[in-house]
Regions:
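Short loop/turn segments that flank or connect secondary-structure elements
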Residues: 1-193
Length: 193
């Protein structure tokens, strides 16, 4: 029905894998995305890209006139997830839950999570999701304790560049590249592990 593709405001946050998929699938740069379908916002002091809704219905820019997704194969993780949600346990993991009243489409049928998400290597993907969530949580804490505003701003821009603006090598495994960047970022801002 595509109701979840309309009126979402700036809530469709994009993670590094989403940007990787979009830039690879659309054969463009992060800057190209910023000039067309992505915008930046500050959330809890963290610079985050999100999908930029368009028109009077505030719809996803990739929703076609028939109400179908033009980028379904490379759609963002939050779009893949809906109407599921994630509950993070605080110990490095998470569980899925079904938002039973959020999706208006009927009838609903049982689908395995790995099939619903439609990602290859579900274990590696879930590991990435957890790592990214907990890294952001730790980074917010560390950056929140720094009193020098100019340094905090510099570190936020560093993270934006490292995880989003700096192109990923499409000939190399995304997860390995992300891991390398994650370790670099942790070291740079002083997160253990």
């Amino acid at each position: 029905c595509s109701d979840c593709c309309r009126g979402m405001g700036n809530s469709i946050f994009l993670d590094p894998m989403d940007i990787y998929r979009l830039t690879t699938g659309l054969e463009c740069t992060f800057e190209d995305l910023l000039s067309t379908c992505v915008e930046l916002q500050v959330v809890d002091g963290f610079i985050q890209p999100n999908m930029k809704m368009t028109g009077k219905e505030e719809q996803c820019p990739f929703l076609n006139e028939k109400g179908r997704c033009n980028i379904h194969a490379i759609r963002p993780g939050i779009c893949r997830l809906f109407p599921l949600g994630r509950c993070y346990d605080g110990e490095g993991g998470f569980q899925y839950f079904l938002q039973i009243y959020e999706c208006k489409k009927e009838p609903k049928s049982k689908v395995k999570i790995k099939n619903w998400l439609g990602v290859e290597e579900i274990g590696r993907y879930e590991n990435f999701v957890a790592q990214w969530h907990y890294f952001q949580k730790d980074a917010r804490k560390v950056l929140g304790e720094i009193s020098q505003e100019a340094l905090v701003k510099k570190l936020h821009l560093y993270l934006l560049t490292l995880f989003y603006q700096k192109p990923y090598d499409v000939k190399r495994d995304f997860y390995n590249q992300f891991e390398q960047r994650l370790q670099e970022a942790k070291q740079q801002i002083g997160i253990a592990g």
